[in-house]
Structures are given as structure tokens and as C-alpha cells.
Amino acid sequence: MQGKSFPGQCKKAQSYCLWLEKWNYTKRQELVNLSGEPPTSPGSALLVLGCPQVPVQTSIALYLINRLKKSGFVPVVAGNKAANTLLVIADPDRHYLGEVMDLDRAVAMITDKKRDFDRCFVFIHNDAGISYAATMGAISRAKVFTLVYGEHYDELVKQIDFPCTIIAAKAVHNPLPLKKALDEVTPWAA
């Protein structure tokens, strides 16, 4: 920590930066348990978001991120630009939101075996969502959960013919039916 220079910054900012660096080091040290190994967590979770045409997607995504984080998962959001932007604007201080990436980039990284996840939650309100869920089931080792919603959710559920856990409800503007269906499955439980 010594020897750092803070050109053009006041003393208060310097001391805050040094305090923050020391605090981060302390927190990293706390992550090591008695055996010297980092603590185990349930793992990582990918949330796949498509076009945010149906209003419930953003609120359910934030709710799911919160539940996953409380259970020890590290959630990552992969969506199109509109879906990602809605989440970033809804949570500007990143209280819930962590890593956010482009959906096509996430698919490429998983396909190239550069990254994978333990759980994958695909938000579905149209045929494209079903295609993404099938793709994730084929390229990833993750356990796939499909969140099917919208006016015609029942027709979409009938099209799912690949292994996954289906969470479905008629939810367009009111997220509570989908939240209830999600809570019944508790996909964040280890």
C-alpha cells in the first residue's frame, strides 16, 4: 500500500483509497476457511433475457438475481441490449445486478468452452426464447430452467421438448403469478 501516488487528489481521497484497498484485502482474507481453501458456494447462474417486450421480465429477473445471491450463487445476466439496459437503469448502484454481458457473447463463450455455469434460467415469451433454451441445454453443462410467461404461455410450454425444469405462468404486466411459480420450484435451493 505504501508508495502509491495520488496526483492531483486531496488527502481525504488518498486516505479513503488506502482504507478501501485495506478493507478489500481483509475481505478477501475472510473468504479463506480453516482448511485454507476458499468456501464452496452453490455455483454460478446465467440468466438469459430476450426482448423485453413483456413487462414482467425485468422485475422477475431482479427478483431471481436477489434470491440467487442470497443462496450463494453468482448470477450473470446475458441479454440483448434493450434487456440489459433496462436492468442497468433499474439498478444503477448494482445492489442486485452483477455481471452483465451480451447474449451472443455468452453463447460464444459457452460454445468455445471458455465459460460455463451451474444453472441457466432462460426467460421465454416467444419462439426465440425456446430456441435459446434448447441451445443452452445443448452447449452448457448447466441445469436449465425455463421461465415461460406472457399472454400465450401455455402454447409455448407445449413446444418445449428438451430436458429442463419448466416454470410457467400467465404473467404480462403483473409479475406475481410468475413469482409464485418460481417460489414453488425454489431453483436457488442447493
Model regions and ranges:
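Structural motif
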Residues: 49-51, 121-127, 147-150
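Histidine-anchored nucleotide/phosphate-binding helix
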Residues: 58-70
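N-terminal beta-loop-helix "entrance" segment that forms/cooperates
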Residues: 81-102
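Mid-chain, well-packed structural core segment of small domains
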Residues: 115-135
